[in-house]
Amino acid sequence: MKEKHTKLLIRDAIYSTIFVYLCILVFSLNPLNLKVFNLIGSSMKDIEFTDIMFSGKNQGHGEIETKISNDIIVVNAADRGRAEIARLIDKINQEQPAVIGVDFIFEGPKDEFSDSMLAASFNKCKNLVLATKFKNNDGERHNDYIKTASTLGEHTEGFANLMIPSMDKTVRYFRTEDQGNKTLIRPFAFEVVKKYNPSQAEKLIKRHNQFELINYEGNLNNVHHFNGNDIEAGQFPKDFLKGKIVLLGFFGSDCNSNPILDDYFYTPMNEKIMGRKFPDTYGVVIQANIVNMILTEDYIEKTPAWFDWLIGFVICLLHNFIFIRHYVHKHLWYHFYAKIIQFLSAFVLVYLCIYLFKENHIKLHVSPLILPVLLTVDLLYFYDTLLKWMHKKFGTNTYFLTGPAHH
């Protein structure tokens, strides 16, 4: 009899786990468009607990605490027009940097004087990368590609678009390639690294990932940066730019102390994980983080969704073995015991995900691991009712009938 009950327990644990996953599927599809299902469905979108690891890297307002490579320097062009940018590039180029990456979009011709100055400055650069963009900024494939104005000459280009999901507007990923005018185009940061260290750039391609999760090392306080005025005045250490990657972009106006939101983004480095009011990082600094990640091969390995759901299924199955036994034989205390186990399991799983991310740069999706465990405690009541009905209707045997009557 005991062996028979064990077989029934195993069968019901498996079937109840499948039942939980069928309910999750219904919740996510929400065929009746119920608001409660919308809430549950939205919670299935990965809760970015890994943001905890990045949050706070935006802090610090004193000395630069360099975490981003010393080979990367960011220069603020501020409010300069094309002629002023040309003069700034000339000054930078005199210092013999290895690569100059210009994170500005020069769309269409301007006045002839400014364009001729900028074109001349570009031509003097040994290794130059210019930013381009796709018109829509959500990371989807599209063909509306904006290149540098032809009046400025032909130079190496890479798209500077950042992936900005509509839900929380947080930049976590970048696309490793895209199609523009039927041509394969690589991102701006990749082209910069390719000029500086081709072998490191090639390693990114060999990963064969359409998207890469950005491993943020820090904001302005974690990278060497200068204002354009300081560069023009020579107020920087001698030979400091020589042989380095110099990224020229925008991270503050000389005329307005308030942040300019056009190229200002939310990132996981924001001090507030939830309830954020203001963006925290300028686009050129995000590009510096991407360049740093490619150079150092400090990639984050993201597990495939099927793997996360499979692990989640096994975890839910193991919990159901415990929950069903308590439900049938210790029903009076079932909910109390189950909620304690549920809480401890959720804590351990979140901690494990954060630990793997911090120590091994492995990112698991948290929702597929935790959501089934959170739902199964209450869904067992529905599963029990269903099995009792099937027993009366079809004579189906079940482990739920092996304990004392508790209803």
Predicted regions and their residues:
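Non-transmembrane functional regions of envelope-associated proteins
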Residues: 2-207, 241-334, 342-346, 374-383
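General structural signal for secondary-structure boundaries
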Residues: 48-53, 224-230, 282, 304, ...
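Active-site Gly/Thr loop motif
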Residues: 210-225, 285
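A Trp-anchored, charged/polar loop motif used as the substrate-binding/catalytic surface
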Residues: 221-239
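Alpha-helical transmembrane segments forming the membrane-embedded cores
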Residues: 308, 329-407
